[in-house]
Amino acid sequence: MYIALRMSRDKVAIPTITSEIRYLGSFFQWMQAEEIIHQNPMLKIEKIKEPKVRKEALTDIEVEKLRAVVCDERERAILETLLSTGCRVSELVQITKTDIEGERVLIHGKGQKDRFVYLNAKAMLAIEKYLEKRKDKNQYLFPGSTAIIKSTSHLSPKDKHEWWTMPEHVKSDGHIEKGTIEDIMRRLAVRAGVKKANPHKLRRTCATMALRRGMPIEQVSKMLGHEELTTTQIYLDLSEDELAQAHKKYVI
């Protein structure tokens, strides 16, 4: 009755209901362990199946719109690296300059599992031009800023945007924050008129583009750093139109 009321009367989303069921189950389990109750009533509650929501990747046009409004070399390097490698934002911020070996990049993944990913020509050129303007000695590909940069009133409009070219405003050590990357992508999406272009959507876009161009799903899974192939299959869920086109191409 409680769950039905939460869904019908309170219009609570299914993920919230699922969490509440889990919390209540833990609470009654504790009560049972303390012998306050004899049986956990939540054991009879069936799990609610969440409807599968398809998460879209960016279209080719949306990707080009993002590229068209990039403001500087750092923004372009961030955008192209995410699109080319499909790495997580937590992995992007950890990349050092020595992790890059030509087109190959060493990624420090989840659970201390390293892997190599690869840069396409656009990403390699973007990183090269970006590093040419860097004059600091910070080891990270995308370093963090010093506290002084928070006050930019003394800088020219150009310098306010390209503070990272001035060593005095770059941390001697330490990488850019994940939140900063997300903010950069959020502003880029607004300028481009693209709905949502966060780092995770770029990761999905990289994977989806690779699959559409014929990259085997096992290789895509390895590129993304997935332990299970089923995780990659969720990322690469095809639309009905894409499935229909694939059927025409591959099924006689």
What does each model-identified segment do?
Residues 1-54:
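N-terminal core-binding DNA-recognition domain of tyrosine recombinases/integrases
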Residues 34-65, 108-110, 147-149, 168-171:
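Flexible interdomain linker/hinge and immediately adjacent N-terminus
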Residues 37, 51-53, 60-89, 113:
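Basic, Lys/Arg- and aromatic-enriched nucleic-acid-binding interface segment
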Residues 80, 84, 187, 203-227:
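C-terminal catalytic core of tyrosine-transesterase DNA break-rejoin enzymes
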Residues 85, 90, 94-129, 147, ...:
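Conserved tyrosine-mediated DNA breakage-rejoining catalytic core shared by Y-recombinases
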Residues 100-102, 195-196, 215-234, 241, ...:
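Short, polar N-cap/turn motifs at the start of nucleic acid-interacting alpha helices
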Residues 120-194:
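Active-site/catalytic core of tyrosine-dependent DNA strand-transfer enzymes
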Residues 122, 129, 238-252:
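DNA/chromatin major-groove-contacting recognition/catalytic segments
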